[in-house]
């Protein structure tokens, strides 16, 4: 029972880390990265679908993304979706592909981006702590029901804390790495 609670908490914590990595991947750091476009949805014959499912996205140069749609008639729709997004990129449509040139980041933009990264990291840590609290509450509930002894509860809470500490350490490393990437000129 207690192992299931800990395993469940660990899975939720790992999902939180995966979401963090995904969110940080969409933040532009002066380099072209196809994951920057992950959140862009296009109107594909009346239904919304991710850009990556309607086009090939590649990075032929460090600061250029090239979008090759599966169907040429999607060019205008893709261009419109990129302009509507909060990425601040200007697509260049040549009739068969769309090029996105990622502008150099100014010092001020870099600092703002670092603040965003730290805020996102902090939100992830809060989510991790919430998962820890839920797991500990479930363990304590088992004690109230008489299913666990005080020692088992203490060991369970210690195990949850160890998992929490490891995940928070991983988040800190991810944040520091992203900050270095942003601040590298």
From Swiss-Prot:
It comes from the Bacteria. The keyword NAD does not apply. GO terms for cellular component: cytoplasm. SUPFAM superfamilies: Ribosome recycling factor, RRF (SSF55194). Keywords: Cytoplasm, Protein biosynthesis. One of its GO terms (molecular function) is ribosomal large subunit binding. One of its GO terms (biological process) is translational termination. InterPro entries: Ribosome_recyc_fac, Ribosome_recyc_fac_dom, RRF_sf. It is found in: Cytoplasm. It holds the Pfam family RRF. HAMAP family: RRF. Belongs to the RRF family. Responsible for the release of ribosomes from messenger RNA at the termination of protein biosynthesis. May increase the efficiency of translation by recycling ribosomes from one round of translation to another. This is Ribosome-recycling factor. It comes from Clostridium botulinum (strain Alaska E43 / Type E3).
